[in-house]
Each structure stands twice: as structure tokens, then as C-alpha cells.
Amino acid sequence: MAAVGAEARGAWCVPCLVSLDTLQELCRKEKLTCKSIGITKRNLNNYEVEYLCDYKVVKDMEYYLVKWKGWPDSTNTWEPLQNLKCPLLLQQFSNDKHNYLSQVKKGKAITPKDNNKTLKPAIAEYIVKKAKQRIALQRWQDELNRRKNHKGMIFVENTVDLEGPPSDFYYINEYKPAPGISLVNEATFGCSCTDCFFQKCCPAEAGVLLAYNKNQQIKIPPGTPIYECNSRCQCGPDCPNRIVQKGTQYSLCIFRTSNGRGWGVKTLVKIKRMSFVMEYVGEVITSEEAERRGQFYDNKGITYLFDLDYESDEFTVDAARYGNVSHFVNHSCDPNLQVFNVFIDNLDTRLPRIALFSTRTINAGEELTFDYQMKGSGDISSDSIDHSPAKKRVRTVCKCGAVTCRGYLN
């Protein structure tokens, strides 16, 4: 891994000084365990199958080339099938082989012949790449769940291609202000209600209606700001006016789409209509900086800029490098999520928090989407996500597939 600056790669990243294999060997030599590199008490002195690399038949006996967990590739060994007690890995090996052959056939290329004695090198190479990909995605999934501060779990899935975790994305739970921008997360007033649902509360002080009904569903029209109770309020965590601040409550899956839209997000549980799903967070930058970055992003065909234009257009949220699950939510011209502006501890109207609520019931397994041209008013904006004048030079084709598709993201 090439050495890079800490600021460029994130404060928690440092250059790799030795290879993973060397590090594993050093751990074993010193009798040290390190879960993050696969060295555990279970396999420190014993062998555990990590994945299967290859297959052959010798004298009517089936053998698999085994990669041992926590051991370098140089220690891989051929083992007879009868010695392997890993049915799930054997099934995965078979599935990967089948998927590779199906992809080759779909591409109208010549299917490598399998004589049932040995695997063609291309098949074995693909199987190893898939195994390494699963390990990388599992580690990424574990990291995401360590960093999140909300109830809902995050899962990662890729059954489409060999794409691994993004190399330049860092999970955050709240806005990250760029140098020179200050976020004051301390409210200037708070309520003293005993029952915020029935009494005059924070929304009334701000001149708007309470956003939620008794079922914690949003009841105000798009374009109306949400004012939740804050840290100065005397109400407790069960207050009916504390919804967005509790974070995502649903288990979500970042998955690889099969139609060329990259990563997407789907819900693993049913979501009721008008329910809070997630926040859109990222790096808060000036609109001038957004203009500069927008030109670069357009040339790469990516779309992560969200203008904070509730009352002014001074700031933009850039989720390209820093963000949460919303970073992976795809666009749709007929979305199932709606944008709302939210104010909690920071009451600066130039810097609303961006919350995504369901517009209808969303079933388990369904992809989550929002309209990249939609702003908090509920209308199509000419200066909302990735659509400022400097970003109009390159138009990105829309692949949402909706009947009402406009053809372009910007």
C-alpha cells in the first residue's frame, strides 16, 4: 500500500509497513493474537479453513486447495474432500464456479471446458478473487457497524461483480465542517413541556407545526421545516418530538446493483409510510468550493453534492468522501424517500440537517431511492443536488428505470 498523507486518507489511516502475510507470520512467532488480521486463539496453533482456492481429482479422489485462516498463501495445501468439515465453504466454492461459467456464457464467450479433473486457471483465479472480496466486504461491514451510532445494523452484499469496499470513503454520523466553517450545535432555547405532543413546544416557538403524529410518522407537507426538541429541552428521550436525532432504526443493506448503477441501499425490514429512514450527512463546504468540486465530479460521473438552500445558498453538503449510508442511496425519478430540512441543536437556518422520510410503505428487500433534484420544498430544484450552473456542462444519464424517468440526473 503506497504511503499517503493522513489528511488525504483519513486521520485513522497509516501506511502499511509490511505485507499481511508477514504480519501474520510475526504474530505467530510472538504468539500474539490479532482478530483484524485473522490471528485468533482458535487458529494460533491450529488450522482453520478460510476459503477454498482450487480443485482437482487424483486417482478418483477429490482434492481442494485450502487457504488456512491466519496463515500466508505459501502455506496453502491440497486436502482430500473427506478431511474437509466446511460444508458452507464447499457450497460457496461450487456456487462461485457456477456463477463464473454463467457469466462467461452470458457474455457469449467460449465457456472453459471443465473435465472434472482440474479447474481452468481462470476459474480458480475468479474463485479466489471472490473469496478475498467477501473477506474485504465483511471487514468493511464490521467497520461500518463499529462507526455508526444508530440502532439499525448495516450489511454489505455483492453478488454481481468483484467490486470491493470503496477505497476513499469514511463513515461519519454527522456533518463534518470544512476548515473555516463553524457548526454551533448548541440551541439558544428549549422547551419545558411535560407533554410535547399536546403543549406549545419547539415547533410553535419557531412558528411551525409539530412534524409528527402519535405513530412517529411525519404529518407536515414537504417544504415545511422540522423543529425537534433539543439538548436544552426538559423533555426526555421518549419525547414524541425526538425522531431524527435518534438515528436510523432500520437494518439496511448496501448492495451492488445489477444494472450499472454501482452500489445501492435496500431495507431489510418493512418501513411504514411517512417514517424517518436516514439522514444525509457529509462534509459541509461553501457554495464556491462546491462549484469547483462539482466540475471534477461531473467529469467522473458521480453525484454527491446537496445544496443547503432552505433560506440561502451559502453551504453545500458533499458526501463523496465523508458520509453515512445515504452516500450509497441511488437516484430515482419516482423515489420512495422525501427530503425534509431539520433543526435540532443547530438553529442556524443556513445549515439545516437533511432527513429522508418514506413516501409510502417500503417492503423488506426493496431499494431505497430519492430524487437527486428534489429539495426540502418538495419541488424540483434548479439548484439542488449536483445541479448548480458549473455542474451543467456534463449531463449524467439516469438509469432509474422509472416510467416517469426524466432521462438525466442533472
Swiss-Prot record:
Catalytic activity: L-lysyl(9)-[histone H3] + 3 S-adenosyl-L-methionine = N(6),N(6),N(6)-trimethyl-L-lysyl(9)-[histone H3] + 3 S-adenosyl-L-homocysteine + 3 H(+)
GO molecular function: histone H3 methyltransferase activity; histone H3K9 methyltransferase activity; histone H3K9 trimethyltransferase activity; S-adenosyl-L-methionine binding; transcription cis-regulatory region binding; ubiquitin-like ligase-substrate adaptor activity; zinc ion binding
Residues that bear Phosphoserine: S381, S384, S388
Species whose genome carries this gene: Homo sapiens
Localization in the cell: Nucleus; Chromosome, Centromere
Residue span(s) of domain Post-SET: 394-410
InterPro entries cross-referenced by the UniProt entry: Chromo-like_dom_sf, Chromo/chromo_shadow_dom, Chromo_domain, Chromodomain_CS, H3-K9_MeTrfase_SUV39H1/2-like, H3K9_Histone-Lys_N-MTase, Post-SET_dom, Pre-SET_dom
Pfam families: Chromo, Pre-SET, SET
UniProt subunit comment: Interacts with SMAD5. The large PER complex involved in the histone methylation is composed of at least PER2, CBX3, TRIM28, SUV39H1 and/or SUV39H2; CBX3 mediates the formation of the complex.
UniProt keywords, alphabetically: Biological rhythms, Cell cycle, Centromere, Chromatin regulator, Chromosome, Differentiation, Metal-binding, Methyltransferase, Nucleus, Phosphoprotein, Repressor, S-adenosyl-L-methionine, Transcription, Transcription regulation, Transferase, Ubl conjugation, Zinc
Protein name: Histone-lysine N-methyltransferase SUV39H2
Record function comment: Histone methyltransferase that specifically trimethylates 'Lys-9' of histone H3 using monomethylated H3 'Lys-9' as substrate. H3 'Lys-9' trimethylation represents a specific tag for epigenetic transcriptional repression by recruiting HP1 (CBX1, CBX3 and/or CBX5) proteins to methylated histones. Mainly functions in heterochromatin regions, thereby playing a central role in the establishment of constitutive heterochromatin at pericentric and telomere regions. H3 'Lys-9' trimethylation is also required to direct DNA methylation at pericentric repeats.
